[in-house]
Every structure is written in C-alpha cells, then in structure tokens.
Amino acid sequence: MLNQVRVPAALLAGIAFGAVFGMPLTVGDGFSLGMRKRVYVLMAACSLAAELVAIVSSTVGIMKLSEPREMPTYASPILLLRGELQFEWIATQFNFLFGLLMFAGAIALRAVSVIDCPNLAKSVSLLFVAVALHMYGIVNKFIRTLSGCDNIAGLGWQYFKLVLHQGGFLNYASIACMVAAAYYLGKVSSHTWHVTRAAVHVACS
C-alpha cells in the first residue's frame, strides 16, 4: 500500500517541480496578478515539498517492513500499517493528499492568470476547483478507515503531533524553518501591498 502511494507521489513531484517556475514574477505585474502569481508559486512549491516527504516516508516504511522481526497478526494491511508504521503511514497519507490538493489549486489559479479568454479561464479554473473539492470529499469519506482521522485537517494535526513525538534536532529544525518561511511569506504580502498602493497613488496624482 505504501508503494501504491509512492509511485504517483514521485510522478506528481516531477510535474510540480516544473510548475513551480512556470509563472515567473515580473516588475510590471499589477497587485492582483502579482498576488496570484505569488500564491501560485507558493501552492506549487507546497505540492512539490509535500510529495517529496511522501516519497521518503513511504520508502522508509517499505524498508522497515522488509526487516526480519516478529510482529503480531493483524486483520488487515491497514491495521498493520497503523500499528507498526504509524508515523510513516500518516506522513505518507497526509503529504500525498495535501500535495495533490495544492497542485489542483495551483492549476486553477494559473488558469485565470494566463488564459486570455476570460470565459475559458473561468471555466478551466472552476473545473479544477471542482476537482479539488471532489477529491477532498472523497478523502473525508474514507480517511477514517485509513487513518482513524475525521478529515484531512485532523490527519495533518495527527501528523504534526507525531513529528513532535518523534523529536530530534532535525525535526525541530524543520519546524523552525517552516516558521521562518511563514514569516518571510508575510513580508512578501506586505511588501507587495505597499508597492502597489504607492504605484496607484503615483498614477492618480
């Protein structure tokens, strides 16, 4: 089951890598287009990062299953994964699903930014929004059986708690880097807003 996630995660990571740099930022972008581009880059980067973690987590889980050791008998493969490889299984599920949703959202955002025909742009964008919502609905319906969580938000919270429980310098350093990334993201939003306001003020004066 881990390998069934690892393969599509690897394929999606390859696509997301190209998508991250698919909408370069330019100086002449207005506030709306500039913000859409920045959100698109962020969503594509989140998709790539999440799929990379899913690949590593599933690979580690597969390698652990190959270790010669005695294990209790489980009624199903899912119970085996939840019992013996809880961290790897939760990490694989959450990052794969989160990356998939981020990728669908990024495509929807890109459609309204680069397609010149307004009606077609809205049609394509809404198509991918519908796909993202449908995928989220499918996940919420079956995720309790797979992980014991009610929805993907609960799955993410469980994943975060497991990361804290794992401990270790590298895990804490990773969390610190995520906090720093959020800080700089806030600075990007603030800078874009102030620059655009200044440009509008100059144009109107």
Q: What are the roles of these predicted feature ranges?
A:
Residues 1-29, 44, 49-68:
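Cytosol/matrix-facing amphipathic helices and coiled-coil assembly/linker segments
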Residues 34-204:
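Alpha-helical transmembrane segments of integral membrane proteins
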